[in-house]
A protein has these predicted regions:
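Accessible peptide chain termini
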Residues: 1-2, 260
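N-terminal ligand-binding/catalytic initiation module
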Residues: 2-168
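Glycine-rich phosphate/diphosphate-binding loop of Rossmann-like nucleotide-binding domains
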Residues: 87, 94-112, 164, 170, ...
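Residues at the C-termini of beta-strands that transition into short coil/loop
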Residues: 120-122, 172, 230
Length: 260
């Protein structure tokens, strides 16, 4: 296979032109499938497919855990999105989100050696979306949810957590929460403050915001010291909000940021 030509990108270059050239250069996109076993003879073909392929199939039918031994399930993640909350772009739909999901699969492979397949699903109903993901899950060793709008993403995650035996990771929730929490713990160590005593103000109550709030309160931040703002202001108990925001609502008429 010919070596791919490198694009020299400079901040002064036109980003749109460079990006479109990068993605359209043949082969288009950023992913392809690699064969991991030799196919040099008829015998090789008879092992890769019929009749030899029947043997691992029979083994897996007797013990599903053997799928990790005989297939790529042990190193394969599904990057799943419906394109309803793509960073910086919003609800652009399943197909338009494909370049982003391919990009996330590239990160898995390049930085961790984990094979990943991007799967874009045209479904906004969270229960139906979860059911689709559950149906395709046997092929994968893990599920990475990506760019699914809140609060639907919480519903999808809760359903899959109950139904699947493989890891389910929502980057926008869990990845962001881990990073922010680590930053908070390090900052508190530097200023010599206890996590139980500090007040935390959060701007944003979507997928990332709620997940961050859950993790930092689990680490010791008191809910009474956590002040979460959404697009309409401070989340308080007298506002009509979804149950995920309501968990972190403050009493009405609270203005604690100005209080000691």
């Amino acid at each position: 296979m010919a070596e791919a030509k490198m694009i020299e990108y400079h901040p002064m270059n036109d980003l749109k032109t460079s990006s479109l050239e990068y993605h359209s250069r043949k082969p288009a996109g950023k992913l392809q499938i690699k064969i991991t076993k030799p196919i040099r003879s008829v015998d090789d073909l008879s092992l890769a497919y019929t009749p030899g392929v029947a043997e691992p199939c029979l083994e897996i039918s007797k013990d599903v855990k053997k799928a990790y031994q005989y297939t790529n399930k042990n190193n394969l993640v599904a990057v799943v999105s419906n394109g309803s909350a793509v960073l910086g772009l919003g609800d652009i739909g399943a197909l338009a989100s494909k370049p982003v999901m391919e990009g996330k699969a590239v990160l898995f492979k390049h930085f961790a050696g984990v094979d990943a397949v991007d799967i874009e699903i045209d479904e906004k109903n969270p229960v139906k979306l979860a059911n689709i993901i559950e149906a395709i899950s046997p092929s994968f060793g893990g599920i990475n949810l990506e760019d699914i709008k809140a609060p639907a993403c919480f519903v999808v995650g809760e359903i899959l957590k109950k139904k699947l035996s493989i890891p389910v990771f929502h980057d926008d929730q869990h990845g962001t929460a881990v990073i922010v929490s680590a930053g908070l713990l390090n900052a508190l160590e530097i200023v010599n403050k206890k996590i139980e005593e500090v007040k935390v103000v959060m701007t944003g109550a979507g997928a990332a915001g709620i997940a961050i709030a859950k993790l930092i309160t689990a680490l010791g931040v008191k809910k009474s010291n956590l002040f979460m703002f959404d697009s309409k202001g401070l989340i308080t108990a007298n506002r009509e909000v979804n149950k995920y925001k309501a968990e972190f609502a403050q009493p009405p008429h609270q203005s604690p940021v100005c209080q000691e």
